[in-house]
Amino acid sequence: MRTLTVVCFVALCLSAIFTTGNALPGELADDVRPYANSLFDELPEESYQAAVENFRLKRATCDLLSGFGVGDSACAAHCIARRNRGGYCNAKKVCVCRN
């Protein structure tokens, strides 16, 4: 039974290594623009830099990591990295940093 498991695992690894997949998207036509980047494409260079610096996902720390049980700890670490005195996840799953 153990030998069969090892053989299946090796076969799975080899198939994953040698399978040729294309992770890159195909060529887009000139008239088709991706909507996700349309805000950043239309901004001048100074505004683009400011938009990138101020882009925040406030719920990412508490929402995404709450499934692993480290939501509040990750929020506190995030706030300490921002030179605050810690933080917590509120009822809406938004990280709130203490001053």
Swiss-Prot record:
Q: A single Pfam family, by name?
A: Defensin_2
* Keyword Secreted belongs to the record: yes
Gene3D superfamilies in the record: Knottin, scorpion toxin-like (3.30.30.10)
- Where located? Secreted
Q: GO cellular component terms? A: extracellular space
Report keywords, A-Z. Antibiotic, Antimicrobial, Cleavage on pair of basic residues, Defensin, Disulfide bond, Immunity, Innate immunity, Secreted, Signal
| UniProt xrefs under PROSITE patterns | INVERT_DEFENSINS
Give the principal location in a single coarse category: secreted
Q: In which tissues is it expressed?
A: Hemolymph.
Tell me what happens on changing G26E.
Answer: In isoform C1
**GO terms under biological process:** defense response to Gram-positive bacterium; humoral immune response; innate immune response
Q: List the disulfide bonds.
A: C62-C89, C75-C95, C79-C97
Excised during maturation, the propeptide residues are 24-59
* Induction comment from the UniProt entry of this chain: By bacterial infection.
Which family would the database say this protein is a member of? Answer: Belongs to the invertebrate defensin family. Type 1 subfamily.
Cite the PANTHER family for this sequence.
Answer: DEFENSIN
Q: What role does this protein play?
A: Antibacterial peptide mostly active against Gram-positive bacteria.
Name of the protein described by the UniProt record:
Defensin-C
The record lists the organism as Aedes aegypti
